[in-house]
């Protein structure tokens, strides 16, 4: 029975060590991404807009169009953009 506990303990240790290695890799990658944003900023690009572009590129076209339509609806409701009337669309 102690052999089974030893195997479980070894498996648990292996999982923990793999997760720790992956967490370290994730931190390294996050640091690399931060460096790229800094480099882009130093070249005159807006990091906030770059993040937005990357976010948009991750979406599929239908999802993006749906979100843009909802955003337009909210902005129109707040008077931040002119409302499109039915006669204007025709």
From Swiss-Prot:
Protein name: UPF0335 protein R02793
Molecular function (Gene Ontology), one example: DNA binding
InterPro entries tied to this protein: GapR-like (IPR018753), GapR-like_DNA-bd (IPR046367)
UniProt similarity note: Belongs to the UPF0335 family.
